[in-house]
UniProtKB/Swiss-Prot annotation:
Keywords: Disulfide bond, Hormone, Metal-binding, Secreted, Signal, Zinc. Belongs to the somatotropin/prolactin family. This is Somatotropin-2. The gene is gh2. GO terms for molecular function: growth hormone activity; growth hormone receptor binding; metal ion binding. The keyword Secreted applies.
Length: 210
């Protein structure tokens, strides 16, 4: 009986520590989801504003090219649909999100278009991406006590954005900016989806369907 009483304080402390860790985890998830939602909305607005500067024929042509082309980050293997996203583990979703955010650290600094909104928000975007990357890394470290299971994809190196479309003709800058903004919007939507599903899983909610 005496041993039971001695163990009770230890169990209570362990329980409180576990609850504290869970609350901190949810706090980090809330911050990460809020930040990527803001980035996604900002990306959507910048893309729409840029499209607004183009003629109708230009928009249609660029959209056709974009649908046939690919984003720099497409080399990062990620779920192809909602079903695959739902089946992916929390750690896998976090790792993919980390790689997607990491892939935009450099191009977010090199986007130079006449759109005044983009010029005004370029530094803000870079800072938010860096903060989000740090936050996701903390979530990854807490998912398996810092022991990561790296996929083969994590060792891949993305082609540099510095040489992106360097051989295009006179309209190259317009096409480059269109595709960069479209890809940025697409990738932020991906990360928002992955982090939202991961957050739901960690909160033990009954329904985490998209």
């Amino acid at each position: 009986m005496g041993q039971v009483f001695l163990l009770m304080p230890v169990l209570l402390v362990s329980c409180f520590l576990s609850q504290g860790a869970a609350m901190e985890n949810q706090r980090l998830f809330n911050i990460a989801v809020n930040r990527v939602q803001h980035l996604h909305l900002l990306a959507q607005k910048m893309f729409n504003d840029f499209e607004g500067t183009l003629l109708s024929d230009e928009r249609r042509q660029l959209n056709k090219i974009f649908l046939l082309d690919f984003c720099n980050s497409d080399s990062i293997v990620s779920p192809i649909d909602k079903q695959e996203t739902q089946k992916s583990s929390v750690l896998k979703l976090l790792r993919i999100s980390f790689r997607l955010i990491e892939s935009w650290e450099y191009p977010s600094q090199t986007l130079t278009i006449s759109n005044s909104l983009m010029v005004r928000n370029s530094n803000q975007i870079s800072e938010k991406l860096s903060d989000l990357k740090v936050g996701i890394n903390l979530l990854i470290e807490g998912s398996q006590e810092g022991i990561l299971s790296l996929d083969d994809n994590d060792s891949q190196h993305l082609p540099p954005y510095g040489n992106y479309y360097q051989n295009l003709g006179g309209d190259g800058n317009v096409r480059r900016n269109y595709e960069l903004l479209a890809c940025f919007k697409k990738d932020m939507h991906k990360v928002e989806t992955y982090l939202t599903v991961a957050k739901c899983r960690k909160s033990l909610e009954a329904n985490c369907t998209l």
